Amino acid sequence: MITVRRYTDDDAVEWDAFVAKAKNATFLLMRGYMGYHSDRFIDCSLMVSEVKDNGKNPMLVALLPATIHGDELRSHGGLTYGGLVMDSEITAEMCLEVFAAINDFLRNECGVRRVVYKPIPWIYHSMPAEEDLYAIIKVCKARILGRDIASTIQMDNRLKFTKLRHRCVNKARRNGIRVEETGDITAFWHVLDNNLMAK
């Protein structure tokens, strides 16, 4: 049996531990990062568990980072994406059950009539994890309203720079711009924080 409940602040450690081992999660889905937007959105994130045997010791199998806006649930209103975060053991069949349970919970417990679902781009998965895309169409009768683009740089097979890109890099160097790798996240976080506040 699948059970669904809303996330509470008391669940933060369990949430983050699940995100750390999930097959399709990124740091954006950690509660510390998601909490950055807590003053702008009403959190309606869900925790989905499988209950076996006598109902004791439910096992967390999925998370749905989400915000609620009236009778609309968005996955996630404050992030670029926020689809179903899945355990590595989840099967397509179980994912169908998960979405059926989420649908029932949202309709009956939260008064949700519409869901905007932004899946986690496959480039961030540690292993294939698109069961949610199948289940949301099959169970929820979802339809695609739009597509977003996700870009990445493949570090082990870099594309060659164009001549224009070389000129731009040389110009940046002449003007004192440097790019360097560091383990100190403080400077990056300051730039990120300022950019997010400007939005």
Locate the predicted segments by residue.
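Conserved donor-binding loop and adjoining core beta-sheet/short helix segment
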Residues: 17, 34-109
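Active-site rim helix/loop that mediates acceptor-substrate recognition in acyltransferases
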Residues: 23-45, 195, 199
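Short, charge-rich binding segments
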Residues: 97, 104-110, 141-144, 170-172
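Conserved GNAT acetyl-CoA-binding A-motif
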Residues: 110-121
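Acidic-and-aromatic substrate-binding clefts and catalytic sites of carbohydrate-active enzymes
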Residues: 123-129
